[in-house]
């Protein structure tokens, strides 16, 4: 995990240790699931973390793809991410995930981390998944994560979002099983799925803020202990209800030889 004093200024929406946890969980997911080759062309579907936080992953995925692309609907977010990460072989641009300005079958890997759960309807979610499947090459892999609607605390978070109490508005989301079906309907083959990050949403945020206020830098140890305890919930049968995000890995089938 990075030094918390270095991370604090760039993770205004997450405790530094939580940002480091989220980053490592997603990087581990990419290492185990997407496995991009050094020649791969990889797309990440939003740049909020790259623009604002220490939970960024686009420029940390290994093995390093030859070309990294990132899109976001908000031009200021794209510009901020570009200022933070001046990377050769990277292309960051403003684009709608439902209407990608990307050629069909041109990407080797796609990472969509809690992007599509900001869309307004399941129809828009379906359109975005179809569009992502379109730009993926045959044999290419995609990882999609969404807010988990089976987590009871998600609905409190959604209520606060509707009241304007959050820096972003939550949109539609679906269960892991429905996400799997929607990906299959685009023609993709689903390979794996799991739940990610079991910190109790909002509750842990308030708790960590209180610990930081009381203990300052000395709060690192109790917060790290709590994060390990929450992570252990992934081993329980209740993980479908404690996970903050559903994650699904899918692959675009390679047409059989001679198929038209």
Predicted regions and their residues:
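Short catalytic micro-motifs in class I SAM-dependent methyltransferases
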Residues: 114-118
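A short, conserved alpha-helix within the catalytic core of class I
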Residues: 119-131
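Conserved class I S-adenosyl-L-methionine
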Residues: 1-43, 141-165
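Class I SAM-dependent methyltransferase SAM/SAH-binding core
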Residues: 41-99
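A conserved beta-strand element that flanks and buttresses the S-adenosyl-L-methionine
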Residues: 111
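A C-terminal cap/extension of S-adenosyl-L-methionine-dependent methyltransferases
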Residues: 192, 196-260
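Acceptor-substrate binding/catalytic loop of class I
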Residues: 21, 162-178
